[in-house]
Amino acid sequence: MSLVAESNSGTISEQELDKVQLYSDLCLYEEALTKLVDSVDNFKPQLEIGKQLIEADKKLYSTLDLLPQYDSVFTRLRTLDDEISKVDQQTKNILSILNECHDDLNALPLLEEVEFEKKMILKQREKIKSNVLLEYATKLAKFTKIPPTFDKGTIGPNNFIWPAEDALRKGMLAMASLHGKELTKLPGQEDGEEDGSTANEDKNIVKDAEGAEGEIRQDDKKEDDSFVFGANANDAEGDEDKNAGEDEDEAMDSDLDLFNPDEF
C-alpha cells in the first residue's frame, strides 16, 4: 500500500479514492519512483522505469490544475457535514419531544372514561347531601342553633322559616289593592271601554257625593230649626212646669188632689 493510501485509510475508503483522478495519478507517480529507487539500490537501473516516472510526472502536473475544484468540493463537503450534524441534532430533539408527548398522551384517560366520570359527577350533583341542606336551612332560619330556652315539645309558627298566614293574607290584599283594575277587568273588555266605564263610574260617584252633601246640608238646616223649635218648647215646658207647680200647691192646699195631667 502506498503512503498516500495509508494516510487516508482512516477517513475515506480506498475504492472511493480510486475514483479521484488526482489520487490515482499520485499513486502511479509513487509506484514509478519506488521502482526506480529499488533498481538503483540493486545497481541495476532500468531506462523503462525512468520513462514511466516521467510520464506519471507529466500526467500529475496536468491533473494539478483540477486542485482548486477539488478544494471547493472538499469545502462544500465539510459544510454539508456540519449541516448534517445540525439536522441530526434537531431530529434527536424532535424525537425526544415526540416521545415526551407520547408519554403524556398515554397518561391521559380515555374518552370513554372521561364521559363515564362526567355522568357520575352529574348524578352526584343531582343528589343533595343532608349537611349541605342543613347549612342552607340555618342561613334561612332565624336561629343557627337551638336557643337554650326553647322547648322542643312546643312548635309554633313564630319559629318557622316561612311567613305566617296573616302575613300571606296581608301580602295578597296589598297586591290586590295595587292591581285592582286588572283584577276587576272583564275578560272581553278592552282598555278604552274600561276607561269609559271607569269615567262613568267616577261621574256617578261625584253625583252621588254631591247629592249626599245636599242631603246633609238639608238635614243640618232641619236640625238647626228643630233645635230652635226645641229650645222654644223647652221654655214653654218650663213655664208650664212653673204653673203646674203653683196648681199643685193650690191643690194640696185645697183638697189634696195629687193627679197632674201634664205628667202623662
Swiss-Prot record:
Region (Disordered): 183-264
A single GO BP: positive regulation of transcription elongation by RNA polymerase II
Compositionally biased tracts (Basic and acidic residues): 200-225
Keyword Nucleus: yes
Subcellular location: Nucleus
Entry-linked InterPro entries: Mediator_Med4 (IPR019258)
Location (main, coarse): nucleus
Transmembrane portions of the chain: none
GO molecular function: RNA polymerase II core promoter sequence-specific DNA binding; transcription coregulator activity
Cellular component per GO, a single term: core mediator complex
Alphabetized Pfam families for the sequence: Med4
Keywords: Activator, Nucleus, Transcription, Transcription regulation
Residue stretches of biased makeup (Acidic residues): 236-264
Superkingdom per UniProt: Eukaryota
Ribonucleoprotein is among the record's keywords: no
Protein family membership: Belongs to the Mediator complex subunit 4 family.
Functional note: Component of the Mediator complex, a coactivator involved in the regulated transcription of nearly all RNA polymerase II-dependent genes. Mediator functions as a bridge to convey information from gene-specific regulatory proteins to the basal RNA polymerase II transcription machinery. Mediator is recruited to promoters by direct interactions with regulatory proteins and serves as a scaffold for the assembly of a functional preinitiation complex with RNA polymerase II and the general transcription factors.
Subunit annotation: Component of the Mediator complex.
Name of the protein described by the UniProt record: Mediator of RNA polymerase II transcription subunit 4
